[in-house]
Swiss-Prot record:
It is found in: Cytoplasm. This is Serine hydroxymethyltransferase. The gene is glyA. GO terms for biological process: glycine biosynthetic process from serine; tetrahydrofolate interconversion. Disulfide bonds: none annotated. It comes from Cupriavidus necator (strain ATCC 17699 / DSM 428 / KCTC 22496 / NCIMB 10442 / H16 / Stanier 337).
Length: 415
């Protein structure tokens, strides 16, 4: 019925096809610095676009509620085995459709409404699923938050004191806008001292952790959640890693607890990405991600910008824009006009509203994927500073855009 030559997107839906082509061109032409974005390989995209999207497979490998699952069982088991090998985990669930749903799965497995949880404050670098008031985690649970000290590192002493006082049932580590290394072992000891579960959301750092360039939380945590995109460079989705003793509870929480049939085409993409992440080339890539981030931060500092925490020890950094008298919202827009894509982001104790902000968040994974190294990272840092020095000079923006175009032309994403 479906002849491949006749049922192509451009023939069936020219509007969607045009938008896809335009987005492809945008990705090729713009320098991508959003820390949570990356470029997947053609192999990952091919898996996601396969016939596996047709298959319903409620349950788990070998224990399905539908027939005809023998081949999707192979795919899901490969994903499980590979992600366990990648991070040294005892057990894994690869079915969560997102990082947020992975977190929700852990909460559903071990918490009851009204229990106390403790996570990093969203205002100081945490994630909204760690207890933000408007999120399910903030509505269903009693939330206490820890934050940063005067040096803009995690205040571990205050964290321990708060945990001893409030006795949360679950302590959450991980962040969406924190540049330094997190001491997972220390937080784990705090959790153990009060009998709390310890969960790490490593979504931002997963690729670095897989390559050994950022501390691995898996030996220290009861549960580790992650997205499979971002620095891991896979499809958009989630994963839960856990101690073997928690596997049954987590599996039940995901299905039938909060999800029905898994997205087998996405799980196939995850399996492919995990195989890619097990290669020496992926380790070299992540080493370059960290090098590029360091050079980018150093360049911005040399140009008079303040980096929150003073440096980066990972792939991500927050830039304080107050000295330039420009908001994060405005900087995001103007840098976008120069074909440099960033996102506005609150800085610690930000006086601006969340939709305005006093900062921008930058990350190095995507530009490193397209081949940028230290020289290019330095150029990018100077281009950003050039824009922020004269944000309302049209000629300046045009000049930066031309220089950005020269860079992206030299380093195509999909070539």
């Amino acid at each position: 019925m479906f002849e491949r030559s006749r049922f192509t997107i451009d023939q069936i839906d020219p509007e969607v096809f045009a938008a896809i082509q335009q987005e492809n061109q945008r990705q090729e032409d713009h320098i991508e610095l959003i820390a949570s974005e990356n470029y997947t390989s053609p192999a990952v995209m091919a898996a996601q676009g396969s016939q596996l999207t047709n298959k319903y497979a409620e349950g788990y490998p070998g224990k399905r509620y539908y027939g005809g699952c023998e081949y999707v069982d192979v795919v899901e088991q490969l994903a499980i085995d590979r992600v366990k090998q990648l991070f040294g985990a005892e057990a894994a669930n690869v079915q969560p459709n997102s990082g947020s749903q992975a977190n929700q799965g852990v909460y559903f497995a071990v918490l009851k409404p009204g229990d106390t949880i403790m996570g990093m404050s969203l205002a100081e670098g945490g994630h909204l699923t760690h207890g933000m008031a408007l999120n399910m985690s903030g509505k269903w649970f009693n939330v206490v938050s820890y934050g940063l000290n005067a040096q803009e590192d995690i205040d571990y002493d205050a964290l321990e004191k708060l945990a001893q006082e409030k006795k949360p049932k679950l302590i959450i580590a991980g962040a969406s806008a924190f540049a330094l290394r997190i001491d997972f072992e220390r937080i784990s000891k705090v959790a153990k001292s009060i009998g709390a579960y310890f969960m790490v959301d490593m979504a931002h750092y997963a690729g670095l952790i897989a390559a050994g360039v950022y501390p691995n939380p898996v030996p220290h945590a009861d549960f580790v959640t992650t997205t499979t995109h971002k620095s891991l460079r896979g499809p958009r989705g989630g994963v839960i890693l856990m101690k073997a003793e928690h596997e049954k509870a987590i599996n039940s929480a995901i299905f039938p607890g909060i999800q029905g049939g898994p997205l087998m085409h996405v799980i196939a993409g995850k399996a492919v990405a995990f195989k890619e992440a097990l290669t020496p080339e992926f380790k070299e890539y992540q080493q370059q991600v960290v090098k590029n981030a360091a050079v980018l931060a150093e360049t911005l500092i040399a140009r008079g910008l303040r980096i929150v925490s003073g440096r980066t020890e990972s792939h991500v950094m927050l830039v304080d824009l107050r000295a330039k008298n420009i908001t994060g919202k405005e900087a995001e827009r103007i840098l976008g006009e120069a074909h440099i894509t960033v996102n506005k982001n609150a800085i610690p104790n930000d006086p601006e509203k969340p939709f305005v902000t006093s900062g921008i968040r930058l990350g190095s994974p995507a530009m490193t994927t397209r081949g940028f190294k230290e020289e290019e990272a330095r150029i990018v840092g100077n281009l950003i500073a050039d824009v922020l020095d004269n944000p309302h000079d049209a000629a300046n923006i045009a000049s930066v855009r031309e220089q950005a175009a020269a860079l992206t032309k030299r380093f195509p994403v999909y070539g």
